[in-house]
């Protein structure tokens, strides 16, 4: 396996949706999940601050992470929908996608990065803790986690 990181394009939307569904099925232990609605991913391809980082192996997207820049009272970057296809898990791809996002956050001079993780997703929770993220808020079935960059 010789995978690389890249930036998703609009033509990648179907594959990203497949990975999103796979992620939801893993978290919720059911096949009864819905993917993105038509147009949900368009904002990531319009040249603004939102984009999707992907891992690619032999021309196929095997993982993705959505990156959203927020310019409210306090600027922060929100990471959303980290998904690594099953046969590529536990080899460092999720870590590299997050580290790539963290490098981007530093480049744009924003100092807070956050995301939600389902409490039932213990593997992801351990990964985020190992990367220095801390629980910012307990929100019932999930945590809001944050890291100062």
What are these regions (language model features)?
Residues 3, 7-80, 85, 98-99, ...:
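Acetyl-CoA-dependent GNAT
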Residues 105-116:
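Conserved GNAT acetyl-CoA-binding A-motif
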Residues 95, 119-137, 143:
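Conserved active-site alpha-helix within GNAT-family acetyltransferase domains
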Residues 84, 90-103, 126-130:
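Conserved acetyl-CoA-binding loop-helix of GNAT-fold acetyltransferases
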């Amino acid at each position: 396996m010789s995978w690389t990181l890249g930036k998703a394009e609009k033509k990648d939307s179907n594959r990203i949706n497949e990975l999103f569904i796979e992620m939801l099925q893993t978290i919720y232990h059911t096949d009864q999940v819905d993917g993105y609605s038509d147009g949900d991913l368009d904002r990531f391809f319009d040249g603004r601050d939102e984009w999707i980082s992907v891992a690619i192996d032999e021309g196929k997207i095997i993982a993705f992470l959505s990156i959203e820049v927020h310019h409210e009272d306090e600027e922060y970057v929100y990471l959303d929908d980290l998904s690594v296809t099953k046969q590529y898990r536990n080899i460092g791809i999720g870590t590299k996608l997050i580290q790539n996002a963290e490098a981007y956050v530093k480049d744009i001079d924003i100092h807070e990065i956050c995301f939600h993780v389902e409490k039932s997703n213990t593997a992801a929770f351990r990964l985020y803790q190992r990367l220095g993220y801390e629980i910012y808020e307990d929100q019932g079935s999930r945590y809001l986690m944050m890291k100062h960059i």
